[in-house]
């Protein structure tokens, strides 16, 4: 997707992030419109209304960017059958395997450890995993991810001009965040590499695959001046990098 010279991307929140649901962000440069993460099926009407409120229609959306494939980020992809879907194949394949194993009634607790090897390092590990399984069994539907022909794997193809994918893989393998490089104000769409500005522990509904990398990803994001859009919190601006203890 090539842009007109001087075209600048703007970021607009369509669905605000919360501990219950992921943020969905519209990236628009006037001629081209993309959505970062599409949310859950029960949010479809809210997403469609937000698109209309932005002066657009679902058919105007030229592309989807999935930060990763947890259920709260991808299950409205199917609302956009003509859109290219930019994502990491590593994240896609990992999550497809995870959700398949979570459906195993006899062995799911044992199987989940191969995806989340640090599970027992967390006090509420069993609660986290039981919630994950409950949500997966209720909502997971691979048909809602979109057609295989729509996918553009970032391992082989770059994002549209002016947007850059940064791998932030502490949350899940292949997780990507989006750097909006040529906007009026630099913006960083974090996905779940940054759940919220300052209360990740309060809304941690998913155990990171790699806690050390997850913390490094968080610090990386918070070291950037500009507008920050977390996966499960309100967006905020940083004028200068904060000082970490």
Which stretches of residues belong to each language-model region?
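Divalent metal-coordination and catalytic microenvironments
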Residues: 27, 37, 61, 68, ...
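Short, acidic/turn-prone active-site loops that include or flank metal/cofactor-
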Residues: 89-93, 192-195
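Conserved beta-strand hairpin/beta-sheet module of binuclear metal-dependent hydrolase folds
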Residues: 1-53, 177-195
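Metallo-beta-lactamase
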Residues: 42, 90-167, 209-226, ...
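Hydrophobic "anchor" residues on beta-strands that sit immediately upstream
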Residues: 33, 64, 84, 188, ...
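Short loop/helix-cap segments at secondary-structure boundaries that form the rim of catalytic
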Residues: 5, 75-81, 238-242
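Active-site metal-binding motif and surrounding structural segment of the metallo-beta-lactamase
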Residues: 44-91
């Amino acid at each position: 997707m090539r842009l007109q010279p001087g075209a600048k991307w703007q970021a607009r929140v369509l669905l605000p992030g919360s501990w219950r649901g992921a943020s969905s962000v519209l990236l628009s440069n006037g001629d081209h419109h993309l959505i970062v993460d599409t949310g859950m099926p029960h949010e479809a009407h809210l997403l469609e209304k937000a698109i209309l409120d932005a002066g657009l229609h679902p058919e105007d959306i030229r592309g989807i960017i999935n930060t990763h494939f947890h259920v709260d980020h991808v299950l409205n992809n199917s609302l956009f059958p003509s859109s290219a879907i930019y994502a990491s194949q590593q994240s896609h394949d990992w999550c497809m395997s995870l959700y398949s194993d979570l459906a195993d009634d006899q062995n799911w607790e044992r199987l989940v450890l191969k995806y989340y090897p640090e599970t027992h390092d967390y006090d509420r590990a069993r609660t986290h995993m039981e919630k994950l399984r409950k949500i997966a069994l209720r909502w997971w539907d691979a048909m809602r991810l979109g057609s295989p022909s729509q996918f553009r794997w970032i391992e082989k193809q770059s994002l549209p001009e002016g947007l850059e994918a940064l791998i932030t893989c502490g949350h899940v393998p292949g997780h990507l965040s989006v750097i909006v490089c040529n906007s009026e104000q630099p913006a960083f769409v974090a996905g779940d590499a940054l759940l919220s500005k300052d209360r990740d522990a309060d809304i941690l509904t998913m155990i990171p695959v790699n806690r050390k990398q997850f913390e490094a990803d968080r610090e990386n994001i918070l070291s950037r001046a500009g507008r920050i859009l977390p996966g499960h919190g309100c967006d905020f601006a940083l004028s200068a990098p904060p000082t970490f203890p």
